[in-house]
Every structure is written in C-alpha cells, then in structure tokens.
Amino acid sequence: MSRSLSECIDQGRGLVPADLVLKHGRVFDLVTGELVQTDVAICGDRIVGTFGTYTGRREIDCRGRILVPGFIDTHLHVESSLVTPFEFDRCVTPRGITTAICDPHEIANVCGLEGIRYFLEASAHLVMDLRVQLSSCVPSTHMETAGAALEAKDLAPLLDHPRVIGLAEFMNFPGVLMKDPGCMAKLEAFRGRHIDGHAPLLRGKDLNGYIAAGIRTEHEATTADEALEKLRKGMRVLIREGSVSKDLHALVSILTERHAPYLCLCTDDRNPLDIAEHGHIDHMIRTAIRLGAPPLAVYRAASLSAAEAFGLKDRGLIAPGRRADIAVLDSLEGCHAALVLAGGVVADDAAFSARSGVEPVARASVKVAEIAPEAFRCPGNRAETPVIGILPGKIITEHLTAEIEPVDGDKRPDPARDLARIAVIERHGKTGGRATGFVQGFGMARGAIASTVCHDHHNLAVVGIDYADMALAANRLRALEGGFAVAAGGEILAELALPVGGLMSLRPFEEVRDALVTLREAARSLGVTLEEPFLQLAFLALPVIPHLKITDRGMVDVDRFEILP
C-alpha cells in the first residue's frame, strides 16, 4: 500500500485529501511527553501529517481517544504461542503490537533452514510487521540432540534478506567466552549487524568479554542490579514478561524516563491462554504503569526505544515520514486498543481474511518407536541423587540433591517428597537416546504429563509418577504428531495436537486457548500446583539456563557446562 513520494508530499501539505485521517484524537508525543490534540494524516503506509487539521478520503473519528505508536515486541518465539504466525498475527495485532522481532529457533531446531524460511515467507503475508533474527544456536549446545544443526555458512545466504535484522539470542555464552570455533564463525559472519544476547547471571569481566563480541541487546536480566550492570556496559536491556519468565515486577524500578531510551519490552515465550486472559505487550504496559512507572517511560520502551535499539528507524513515533503503526487507546493507563493501524491498514477481520496463506512445514516430525513403561526407569546404585528444583515463575532451576534408595535397581518417584520422574526421549529419528532423572516442584501425586515442546531441541519430555501413564502420554504424542497430553489411571485426560514441528497447532487461536484450559485443569487433577506446567516443563531441558537441566543425553550441570556421570 505504498504511495509515491509526490503523493506523500502533497497529502502532507494538505494540497489533496489524505488517504486516511484520524480526526480529533490526542497524540502522545514520545519526544516531549505532551498530549497534543491533532489530526493524523496517512498516505498509504506512511504518516504524512500531524499537528494540523486534515481532510481525507476516509476519516475516522478518534474524539476522546489517545493515539500512541504501535508497540514492538523486541524478542519472542512465535512458536511459544502454539499457533502459526498467521494466528499469532490475528491474536496480538488488534492489541496494538504492530511489529514483532522473532527468533524462530524452535522450529529451526526441528527442521533447520526450512523452518526459518517458513517464517520469512509467512512474514510477507501478515498484517503486522514480523521481522526475523537468524537463529544462532541450533542446537543450543553440544549436550543435546536437535533435529538440525545450523552453522555460519548455513545462515549466511539469508543475511541480506529484507526481513532479517541480524543474529538471534546468542545463548551459548560459555561458547563465546571459550571462543568455540563455531560460535566465533557466527560472530564474525554477523560482525557489524545486530546480535542479540542471552546471558543469564553473567557479570563482571565475563560479561565484558561477552559484550565485546559484538552483542548489543539482552533479555535475561532478572534483577534490577543485573539489568543496571548491563545498561552501564552499553547493552540495551529488554524487560521480559512471558508465561514462565516474569521479570517485569523485578525490573520496573529501572523503568524511568532517564533509562527508558535504553530499555525495551519483550515477551519471549507467551502462550495463548495468557494472551487471551491478560494480554501481550499491552499487558506489560498496563502492569508497569500500575506499579508506578511513568507512562512516558513505558510507552517509549514499548515503541520508540525499541525501534532505535533494532535499527527500525521508520517507526516508533507518530510523525511525518514514519510508518503508520498506530494504536488508538481509551487511556494511557488502561492501554486497551479501540483501533489499530499496521502500516496504514486497519487491523480488523477484513484485513486478516484478505491475507494469503503459506503451507506449514515439519509435519510428521515425531520419529519415535513405541515407548514401553520400562523406558522410564532410573537405574542407579547410590542413594545420593541430583534433583532439578523448580523455581515457580523462573526458568532458572536449582541443583538439589536427595537421598533416593534404589529398589530392584530403580530409583522410583516419591510423590510424598514431591519427587517426580522426568524423562527426555530423542524424537528426531537420529539416536533414539533417552535420559531419566528427578524433578521437584510439580506437586504431582499421580499420572503423567508429556510434551514435544522442549526447549530448545524439542525432544519428547515426560514428567510423571506412574510409568504406565508416562508411556501412555508419550505414545499419544506420537499419534498426534506432537503436542501436549495428560494421562492418569490408564486414560488420556486431555490433549492438544501440535502437528507443525510438534510445536504449533493448525487450529484457530480460540480453540488452542480452550484446549490449554482443559489441559491445565487436567494437570491440576494430578496434584500439579504450577501455574504453567507445560511451559515450565519445556524449560527444564534447556542446558544454557542455570543450574541443573536434563536433555536426551543426561542430567546437565549448567554451571560446569557438562553432563553429570
């Protein structure tokens, strides 16, 4: 919907009617902090006129409303919404999110470049502007079996794609510090481009070395002190509020007008239930203001600062020449969008219906032989046993130890001590490997839950008390082409098929949301106390997040960066 320069100039000068005029609203100026009554004239996908009165071929009365720049989610994995990019677009764009910067490393870990190309192709057909960061860590480390491996030479052909910003979160920070050849090759290939970071708890001179590798932004700060150190060292900090990783409350104290130019907002991993019940970036804005952050600082972080951090110079302000990404709100505090424009297009049912689709990829990706209950035994001779300790609302875990006496060579789950079996089974048809261990924090008293969403290798993960139920849930996911399942007493209590790479549903967003409600209720019937049991489970297998994790190759001591014997 672009227009010629001549048309933009004439419409901006008011010589001819604008394509669209938003009348009588108040614009929140993110430079001065003023609320200014003005019309906003739009030519094609560009804002061409503000601070004046305009006539348009189409006019929308925004009397009593506040106009703000569209919001930018600076780091997310669309796959965590459990729907395709098209349903994600329909789900969040009407909330004011007009730009999202995604790292498709979930689907890339399943099917490699095919998954990244799927996102790039889909991004050209959406109402929102979906930008792609090329996945840097596929797999995330050498201690897991993923469905693909991407090296610098694989990513290089996509470097100049118009929808690619740069290199996505560099999770293997130990590899950077140890100058691993594969890591160094990627850093060199993207030198001078935007490189996103991922360095939880990294401080001091090690953080200096990591930043010196050319890494500009980072979203893993969980305390104000950690975030301030990263700000002082020149990083842009992305404040995160996902479905599991909830850092906004801990970081809201730094969200001030002084710091806002160097802060952004992101969701990282947010599921449809949270989006439906609470919101997305709009939820973060409401929450931050409610917690006392100045509205000017919050809205800057949500748009202008985000645009500047990622080199998107054509957006972030309601000003002539900028992309017509606008959210029309009831109030700054409420942040409920009555109307959203994305590139000058009204984000409504007609716009979503007009999109052309893209054929999904990575079907039939669960390549696992039938699993027997005996596969979930945990052999051992010593009573002293490492246990993954869950911290609710965090993806960081504790490295605990428990005394578990083996019975007939098997260390068995003990619900009385909240010690459940956890297993990860390779599902990409490569090694057939599996590992078993213990996790504490689910509160599970019976049954099992299973998932093929298992960061970042996305193998088949199962947590349970009863081996037969664990096998039942795992085998059900083989039949569904991946997804979630809850089993107890020899029956499947709830399920959700995720046939696109074992990660995304082909069903509408609303149906996925309803299925998640049923799954959550079924998990609670097993005694599970976690608010987000499936997302919490997914992160227990990510060996770049301290302190103890599990992959298909064994229990991983993340601090020592090694598999436990």
Curated annotation (Swiss-Prot):
Cofactor(s) demanded: Mn(2+)
Catalysed reactions, semicolon-separated: adenine + H2O + H(+) = hypoxanthine + NH4(+)
GO function term, MF aspect, one: adenine deaminase activity
Keywords (A to Z) from UniProt: Hydrolase, Manganese
GO BP annotation list: adenine catabolic process
InterPro entries reported for this sequence: Adenine_deam (IPR006679), Adenine_deam_C (IPR026912), Amidohydro-rel (IPR006680), Metal-dep_hydrolase_composite (IPR011059), Metal_Hydrolase (IPR032466)
Family annotation (CDD domains): AdeC
Assigned protein family: Belongs to the metallo-dependent hydrolases superfamily. Adenine deaminase family.
PANTHER family reported for this sequence: ADENINE DEAMINASE, N-ACETYLGLUCOSAMINE-6-PHOSPHATE DEACETYLASE
HAMAP family cross-referenced by the UniProt entry: Adenine_deamin
NCBIfam families: ade (TIGR01178)
Protein name stated in the entry: Adenine deaminase
Organism in which the protein naturally occurs: Cereibacter sphaeroides (strain KD131 / KCTC 12085)
Taxonomy of the source species: Bacteria, Pseudomonadati, Pseudomonadota, Alphaproteobacteria, Rhodobacterales
Gene that encodes the chain: ade
